[in-house]
Every structure is written in structure tokens, then in C-alpha cells.
From Swiss-Prot:
Residues 82-130 are annotated as: RED subdomain. This is Paired box protein Pax-9. Interacts with KDM5B. It is found in: Nucleus.
Length: 341
């Protein structure tokens, strides 16, 4: 006769899937095991699967109870405030301690037993979430206590002000002799724009204002740059040219140039003072053709009606230019007349 509910296992026993084994069968399994019967023989005798028998016996050996565990319930909380306090104490005593070492200490000190001791992953999570933030806060507080008070920042602008590392670097750079030293507060300050004008956005106005206020030298503003000229600069000393000694310049100009074969600049003659070369006889490029007149082409189709062969567009050719070496080339060449052609 088939049961009204449940399923039949391979041994012929009846079980309900998802439900624990009845307590009577559990007690019988434990009694047979105490009599020395092997789990496989208990499985065949009670028609219960071998895995179920082994699990029940293992739970009884660990907890001493034959009752099943909570189905669908949560595990009891093992990370109690007492456990967290002891974990924090272990971590403060030895910052390099591992999670598994903390677990062993909890068992050794009797804080937890083997049933409610937190796992290694739980201890790591406690160290990361609960104790890690407190440790970082403690380090930060101790750092603030040992940290000296910050120096007041120089106000570079009336709205925003913050320290600039460039001023400290500029203060370390030595100033060469003869050059006026620029105050450290003026050396490349970082400024926030106080308005939407171009000079304030670029920081030009603030730099020039600070230079004019702190430096004894006059620094013109952007509006005055267009009015500056060469007359505004002080004249150099008569014995110095651009800050250099005149005697040194004359000596360098006197002995610094090596003599070469080129004539001096003053020996060249301008082209206007030279007489133009005689104009050679113009030879027509169109030769006499002995064929019928119909085959003779008087000129090109693109030639201007009033133009000449040398100036087809009726343009005047300027006088010949004076070039060096043209006379020698002209004397060495023989003129060719039209009759020879």
C-alpha cells in the first residue's frame, strides 16, 4: 500500500522531502550507534539513507542533542558587543595580528566556545568595518596633536586666499647682484578672479598692483603699457652702450673681425649712379619665309595689335639693370646680326 504523502528512498523507507526525520527514528539511530552497530547497518535496518544517519550521529557527537536544527531560521549572533570589545583589545595590543590568531585567542581566553566563536571572515569584517574606522580616527587625532599650528596664509585676493608653494620656492632661489629682489609674496601668486574682467581673470591687475605697492620700482599697469615709449626709459651713460663698456665694444669690433677678401660696404656703388649698358640691336624672331604668303604667320594669336615682338602686350621694357659680370660676358661673346641668320 502506497503512503498518502511522502516519497520512498532506495532502501524502501518513507521520507518527506524538506522536513526533518522524526525524533523517534533519530533516537533509535543514536541507541543503535551506542550499541556499536555500524552506520551502514543502521541505515539498512531502519531504511534511512546513509547520509541522514551520518549527519544525525555527527550532530549528536558535537552538540549532544538529537533535535534537528532550525529550518529557515538565522544563526545565533556570535559577534556580540563583548566579542567585539575583546577583538578591539587584541588589535590595539598587536596591530599586526591576523584574524585566525584572534579567533584562537578568543577560544583560549574563554570568551567564546567552539559553537559560538565567530569565523575568520566575521572577524575580518569586524576589523574592517567597526575597528578600522576607530583606529583611523585615533591615528588622525594623535597626528593633529603632534602637528604644529599652520602658518597664516598671505591674502592674495580679498575673496579667496590660500598658501602658494611657489612663494617658498622663490624665496630659496638666490638673487644675482645688481638685480632688484622681488618680494616673496609677489613671486607668481595664485589668485582667484574677483570680477569678470580680462585683467582680473588673467591675474595681471593683482600682480601689477602688488608690485607697485611693495617694490620701489615703478611697474606700469596694463592701461599704461600703450603709452610707454623709448623716451620713458632712462638714457644710458655716455661711456656705456646697453650696459656694456664702450671701450670693450670698440676693442671687440676692432680685433674681433677676421679680414676677408670682400670689399667694404662703403665701396659699393648704387645702381642709379652707374651708366646703363648700350642697348643691343634687336633681332626679330620671325624670319623671312620663302613660301606662299598664305603660309606665313605674321604673329601669334595672343599678341597685342599694337605690341612689338619683344613686348607683345604693348608694355614698355625698363632699362637694362646693372649686374656684375655682365660686361665681361658681353665682351667675350660675338654679336650676331640678322644678315648672318
Amino acid at each position: 500500500m502506497e503512503p498518502a504523502f511522502g516519497e520512498v528512498n532506495q532502501l524502501g523507507g518513507v521520507f518527506v522531502n524538506g522536513r526533518p526525520l522524526p525524533n523517534a527514528i533519530r533516537l533509535r539511530i543514536v541507541e543503535l550507534a551506542q550499541l556499536g552497530i555500524r552506520p551502514c547497518d543502521i541505515s539498512r535496518q531502519l531504511r534511512v539513507s546513509h547520509g541522514c544517519v551520518s549527519k544525525i550521529l555527527a550532530r549528536y557527537n558535537e552538540t549532544g542533542s538529537i533535535l534537528p536544527g532550525a529550518i529557515g531560521g538565522s544563526k545565533p549572533r556570535v559577534t556580540t558587543p563583548t566579542v567585539v570589545k575583546h577583538i578591539r583589545t587584541y588589535k590595539q595590543r598587536d596591530p599586526g595580528i591576523f584574524a585566525w590568531e584572534i579567533r584562537d585567542r578568543l577560544l583560549a581566553d574563554g570568551v567564546c566556545d567552539k559553537y559560538n566563536v565567530p569565523s575568520v571572515s566575521s572577524i575580518s569584517r569586524i576589523l574592517r568595518n567597526k575597528i578600522g574606522n576607530l583606529a583611523q580616527q585615533g591615528h588622525y587625532d594623535s597626528y593633529k596633536q603632534h602637528q604644529p599650528a599652520p602658518q597664516p596664509a598671505l591674502p592674495y585676493n580679498h575673496i579667496y586666499s590660500y598658501p602658494s608653494p611657489i612663494t617658498a620656492a622663490a624665496a630659496k632661489v638666490p638673487t644675482p647682484p645688481g638685480v632688484p629682489a622681488i618680494p616673496g609674496s609677489v613671486a607668481m601668486p595664485r589668485t582667484w578672479p574677483s570680477s569678470h574682467s580680462v585683467t582680473d581673470i588673467l591675474g595681471i591687475r593683482s600682480i601689477t598692483d602688488q608690485v607697485s605697492d611693495s617694490s620701489p620700482y615703478h611697474s606700469p599697469k596694463v592701461e599704461e603699457w600703450s603709452s610707454l615709449g623709448r623716451n620713458n626709459f632712462p638714457a644710458a651713460a655716455p661711456h656705456a652702450v646697453n650696459g656694456l663698456e664702450k671701450g670693450a665694444l670698440e676693442q671687440e669690433a676692432k680685433y674681433g673681425q677676421a679680414p676677408n677678401g670682400l670689399p667694404a660696404v662703403s665701396s659699393f656703388v648704387s645702381a642709379s649712379s652707374m651708366a646703363p649698358y648700350p642697348t643691343p640691336a634687336q633681332v626679330s624672331p620671325y624670319m623671312t619665309y620663302s613660301a606662299a604668303p598664305s603660309g606665313y604667320v605674321a604673329g601669334h594669336g595672343w599678341q597685342h595689335a599694337g605690341g612689338t615682338p619683344l613686348s607683345p602686350h604693348n608694355c614698355d621694357i625698363p632699362a637694362s639693370l646693372a649686374f656684375k659680370g655682365m660686361q665681361a660676358a658681353r665682351e667675350g661673346s660675338h654679336s650676331v646680326t640678322a644678315s648672318a641668320l
